[in-house]
């Protein structure tokens, strides 16, 4: 666990120190004082009463001794509880389908003052240009948007076609950027364990920063070796004992609750007073509909308190201080003298009801964020341009021939999990022996002119129609599932025409579609508009059968080879346990 102070992120001049100290001593006037407030003590438990004194970006003092201190402005908290701003320990903003600017508008008023982001979705599509845009957005954001340098582009070498490379030389060019906190999730864990020099070179280059992991279900000697390489955390744990073992071996545990991967219920029982400094919260991938209707990190805190009886100070600790310590962000995570004034005022701490948010010492106004969003997005110079280099397809492109009596591999979906199971199904003249089997195909979209890779999918719940998307981790080729080749072709052609996006087809017609003009991943619409469009897509998808709660996010992970057990990439059917391609027909 990285508990060191990373001085790269704590910029305060000597003049600022002198002004801050003068206010702390009571010799100068504060910029803001928050009165009538109780501060949740994340270290000892309980509460601290008394004002919070702010000078510039920082907290100058806390407690009753400042009751009569002078200030330019006073904020009446009306009896609210103050907690540190929430921190998401690991996410891909692109998966929200919002730009970083829109994401900030949607989440900052909910108390999310800091994010640790890996932009490997857009980097897989357009390389360094995508990372550069995220850095520009982070530089101008009010929200603390930190970046982990994407380590695996593509996720696994030789297993898929993606849009760009991101070389070690390019990665090193960003290592010292003020918003960079470390190396993003090292997904090729077999390569790390086997000591591949190219991967160890990346780890060595970023060893003074934070090294993110990715090792779902890993245990035994392999887990020991992965940690021995220097990997410090994992957000992919989905079983209680798996999480416990990782904590025992010194890993920090990121407890994830996204739109598709929902691991909080499984892992929350691990959290206690002793290990909470090594536990963090993250969303990984969360869509705008859920953010609007349920929340972000605030929703995870609420569930820890209400459903898992986690004490208040521990629940808020894992949502802020634990993550700040892990990433060496010593200026964040506590409401204490010298810390950055990222403050969330709660009218109800148990229900996580946000009353007001301050970030870097300034109150946040949601309407101002919305009003400035368009101009700030333009200022960031988004990388527009069609990233779909694929000709329209026809039904014949998805034709598969099956022999009666033969057995075929089926990717079996587990609702609300990213892992899949591998099963087999026998084909007869009447079809497959289980009626949940539908078709899946992945089409590379980067001009390689490859034929679609086709396979079989079970457990998804698709009874009719087709769904297609260019959000398909991590290479973001076109993924389509359907009951008929004709409707699959129609759905694919719609997302090609849109320059990327999501589509639902049923009864031979496009029922709903959402264009994603930035890299085929993100929209430039407002968060509210996006949430409404997602609602329409989900409603159309539900007409196709009893699908997962988030069908497009669940579908997006069916082509990610670094999560077991069976996946489909643009290169073919991939066994995520043996880390090797396999055949559709079962021959052994």
UniProtKB/Swiss-Prot annotation:
EC number: 3.5.4.2
Tree of life domain: Bacteria
GO biological process, any: adenine catabolic process
Catalytic reaction annotation: adenine + H2O + H(+) = hypoxanthine + NH4(+)
Residues passing through the membrane, by range: none
Pfam family, one: Amidohydro_1
Cofactor(s) named in the record: Mn(2+)
Gene Ontology terms, MF aspect: adenine deaminase activity
Keywords per UniProt: Hydrolase, Manganese
Family per similarity comment: Belongs to the metallo-dependent hydrolases superfamily. Adenine deaminase family.
Protein name: Adenine deaminase
